[in-house]
Amino acid sequence: MFISQSKIDDLIASDGAFLDLTTELLRGCADLNAPARLSIVTRQDLIFSGGQIAREVAARFGCETQHLAREGSAFCAGDEIFSARGSFESLHKAWKIVQIVFEYSCKISTYAHEMVALMREANPRCVLGATRKSFPFAKELCVNALIAGGGTMHRLGLHDSVLFFSNHIRAFASFSEFCAQIAKFKERAPERKIMIEVASEREFSELLKYAPDAIMCDKMSPGELRACVLKRDETAPQIKICAAGGINKNNCAEFAATGADVLVSSAVWNQGVCDLGGKIEFI
């Protein structure tokens, strides 16, 4: 995952732009240049992610990363997930920035991993696709964490895919009038997949006649979604079905079992943080 140096600098500036007042008060009482070691330990089972950002932050403070796991690695409560060596003063500047990156990133990758495991148990072909609702100013961290957890991005942004929502369809006098334009949309963007959101079985059935590449069923019950999958299988098996609306770890297996191809979810982005601890010791 490419993360620009300016993003790393912005992250550091948000917490350490000036001086570390607390550590500065120790000057004269302790050797702030003495070599020390920072260790980040997890208090819960997790799927690791965020290592690249942590290493870059540590390096910007002149600290050397000693232990850095592979993205997507599994850790148990009590395991060390990251360590770095540097001066006592520098490690205190890097410490919380690194720990907070891991707290958010690992929570996303862990939750995504748990969802994917539940989905695949119900339907091995079903894919988790996260929405573009990642929290602001942190897309690189969020996307990297999602991938580490086994998920994919449903959409990175407006630029990378075609998805007609009901708000787009209101530009037409009727749903049927919109559907009649699908062939033209394909001509105008021949290398792109055309996906359309529907909110009812009636709209789904009508849309099947026009052969879009994918249909996103929004806020349907598992029963309604299963009925749509059966209709698709009977008439247009090449069309992919995405399910969206309130899908999370508690219900993803049920939705995956309907036969949907992709479960679209924002749940991975709003699960809080992992429980981690940081310790700095002189060496």
Predicted region positions:
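Short acidic, glycine/proline-enriched helix-loop-strand junctions
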Residues: 234-240, 283
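Long amphipathic alpha-helical scaffold regions
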Residues: 239, 245-247
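Residues that form or flank phosphate/diphosphate-binding pockets in enzymes
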Residues: 223, 250
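Short secondary-structure boundary segments
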Residues: 219, 245, 266-267
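Short alpha-helical segments enriched in small residues
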Residues: 5, 279-282
